[in-house]
Amino acid sequence: MTDASDLLSLSYSHYLARAAAARPALAERIAAWAAAPVTRAALDARLDELLAQGGQPPSEDALKKALRQLRGEAFGAVAERDLAGRADVAEVTGTMTDLAEAAIQRALALLAAELEAQYGEPRGPSGERLALGVVGMGKLGGRELNVSSDIDLIFVYEDDGETAGGARAPISVHEFFTRLGRRLIGVLSEATADGYVFRVDMRLRPNGDSGPLVCSLGMLEEYFYVQGREWERYAWIKGRLVTERASAAARRLAQQLDAIVKPFVYRRYLDFGVIGAIRSLHEQIRQEARRRATMRPDKADDIKLGRGGIREIEFSAQVFQLIRGGQDAGFRVQPTLAVLRHASASGLITEEVRAGLTHAYLFLRTLEHRLQYRNDAQTHAMPVDPAERAALAASLGFADYAALIDRLDQHRAFVEAQFDQVFADKADGGARREDDQAAGCIWSGALADDGADEALVARLAELGFADPAAVLARLQAVWRSSRYAGLPESSRVRFDRVAHRALEAAPGIDAAHRDETVVRCFDLLETVGRRGAYLALLTEYPAALRRVLSVLGATRWGGGYLIRHPQLLDELLDDEAIDSPFDWPAFKDALRRRLAAADGAEHQMDLLRHAHQAEVFRILLLDLAGRLSVEHVSDRLSELADAMLDVTIEVVWSQLAKRHRDTPCFAAIAYGKLGGKELGYASDLDLIFLYDDPDERAADVYTTFARRLITWLTTATGAGTLFDIDLRLRPNGEAGLLVTDLDAFRRYQLREGDAANTAWVWEHQALTRARYSAGDARIGAAFEAIRVQVLTTPRDAAVLAKEIVEMREKVLAGHPNTTERFDLKHDRGGMVDIEFAVQYWVLLHAARHPEMIRNTGNIALLREVSRFGLMSEEEAETVGAAYRTYRKLQHRLRLDGMEKARVEPERVAAERQAVAALWARVFGA
């Protein structure tokens, strides 16, 4: 144990030196406390000792004295451990937070008991006991309390009511808790001969100093809804109940408070509007700091409010919480460093930035404590007195003050740069080009003036539009629409800024797509106009608007997808996420965590859709950048579908009331494009559901489960649909059971049942492209064994060829083409001819060449066929190239929004001829 005469804290802190002189036992107490970290249990035990000295029950004066003595001892202990290098920032702030919570909870318990003796216990409308909740805001809420800090508090209670009555007549619950709150403030903050415990600031409550001291949850909710401002959302991020949580009244209050605060602070959508709000708040704080510096030059160098200071780190962290906390529960934490860790883990900042901000934060908080230990003053100003400067530098281990300032400036420069990267106003500055001036004249009140049409058409022509009159008509429709007219002023300002930028960008857009790109951009703006956060994103990040225009110009389908799902705008900001490798296990784990934190089934369904849409959009961006081949696009989309099915099966099963086991013996089997890993952006999923469970309830349970699963996959929520599902390939098609027992599926496919309940040849054709997709992998392996057995069954060539040709004719008849254009998929000489030929070879020859049943795609199977001498290598390459060409054209046409993949016949004349020759050779027709 440190000897009391050697205490660093007494030699450094003038406040502690004075306190020890007035209370001789303090030095020994500090020395004893400083031997180990000060725990909450130790604080409570010491408070018990101090209160016992004042008699039982302790009076209010005895309570004040005990709390002030405890505060002096705890302050000295953390100062000693900190100055000796034995306590880090987390220990110092944690101890001070524990002290505040212990003081609040003990004071409330004693004061409430006194008031209840007079007025009776506070009760709600149904007679239930009520409790006063004390919400710690700011650094208290974040468990980051500094050593000489105010505590920001808000008092809340569950509901209005009346006390039960005691020595005096009953009073309203509101009056009871108001009296309790006033007395609590006095106990904590009143300056006595023993000092104070904590200065209390109540200005963050609804309506500030003009509002009631305590408020019911109903009043708080109404205030949030009607008057809540952006800075209050920021403040409530740190809000945390610091009163006891053990009683039923306290637990009820905590649950209801969380239900009110969470949707106010954390919006369901990505909220980029907070960037401007925080920028404005920061500027107000800076102006106040500059005003104070003018009045007190000795306080000018402020490490909290100045550039690169503590507040800028807090803002840099909390902007992620406000923007993303509604969708990512990992951001709903209070400590600043925890937020930075999650931002780094989520790929929103680099590990280098996280480390730099963390080191700066810890340095600044340590420096802050050194400044405050000196005189127990709530100061953040660097000293001007040479002796004070020297003492400060020495306490931090620097040779002199200049070395300290050099390190401080390095940290502040890093913080300032990171803050500006997020919050700097990115509005274009400088002189406006002629194009800019033209855009400004176009998107203006002139759009409401029919007499200005000719001039506006001329302006649009100057910007390079091919059909300026049509573009003008669209702009006028938007300008005159009720949607635009009804926008709040702040949203309209943002809308106008983005509209100007979109028109200014027109000359740089590919001329072939310029008109439709800008028109689609205004379609998007109309869609997001009432969601100010998206307008804020496009305003704050001009690069995002450039990418939007790029997507809208490159693909009609992608443009429509973005307009339907505007939350995807956020994906345009994150180059690192776009470029990161596809890691489906990590994707599923992250999605599971978000689902576990979601507020109910509806929110979970939305989260599934948002996660899927974000990955589809990422694939699209890579596709448009030419960084994925058509085959790789299909691979990624198919892998994504597998992942989504797997997670959805888990979450739906977990909520099934009838489930009889923890994990379902159930699997989704993929057919068609998903089975062959040739999925497109808008493809249906061809699925069948299998189960293998001996439980007598299994058929009923899995049928119910399958229905629920289909609902989760296909229902249109506010976030859209997840997938369109086609289950017609299940045994007996639409007449069959929704989910099939594995053994029944085996007998059906192997034709071991009665003739009316056995698979057709076309079902075996479909089986060539089938595979396990999601769910129970054991069932997946059993399915693959059945598939192998079916496909390797010997078959008669003539009978098989006849049935496949007949099925080909049915497919052709089912997709009539009355145009002169060639249907890449269904017309003769197209993709279906290649697929049927490959399936014929697999079914006919897999008994001798089982390698052919591998589900590797049609092009790879053509090579396998040639390897076994069933076609020449040259023919395999020619037909494979034709299939690849068809897929590329189909892919491009789908991106262009074409429902039917049809082209001019001469564009693929060589490919059609090669495929027709193949068909004639194989089937003789």
Curated annotation (Swiss-Prot):
Entry annotated with the keyword Glycoprotein: no
EC number: 2.7.7.89, 2.7.7.42
GO cellular component: cytosol
Lineage top rank: taxon: Bacteria
UniProt keyword annotation of ATP-binding present: yes
Catalytic activity: [glutamine synthetase]-O(4)-(5'-adenylyl)-L-tyrosine + phosphate = [glutamine synthetase]-L-tyrosine + ADP; [glutamine synthetase]-L-tyrosine + ATP = [glutamine synthetase]-O(4)-(5'-adenylyl)-L-tyrosine + diphosphate
One Pfam family per UniProt: GlnD_UR_UTase
Cofactor: Mg(2+)
Alphabetical GO biological process terms: regulation of glutamine family amino acid metabolic process
Region of interest: Adenylyl removase: 1-426
GO molecular function, one term: ATP binding
Location of the region described as Adenylyl transferase in the Swiss-Prot/TrEMBL record: 436-925
Keywords recorded for this protein, A-Z: ATP-binding, Magnesium, Multifunctional enzyme, Nucleotide-binding, Nucleotidyltransferase, Transferase
Enzyme class name: transferase
Family under the similarity heading: Belongs to the GlnE family.
Cited function: Involved in the regulation of glutamine synthetase GlnA, a key enzyme in the process to assimilate ammonia. When cellular nitrogen levels are high, the C-terminal adenylyl transferase (AT) inactivates GlnA by covalent transfer of an adenylyl group from ATP to specific tyrosine residue of GlnA, thus reducing its activity. Conversely, when nitrogen levels are low, the N-terminal adenylyl removase (AR) activates GlnA by removing the adenylyl group by phosphorolysis, increasing its activity.
Name used for this protein in its record: Bifunctional glutamine synthetase adenylyltransferase/adenylyl-removing enzyme
Species of origin: Burkholderia mallei (strain ATCC 23344)
Encoding gene per record: glnE
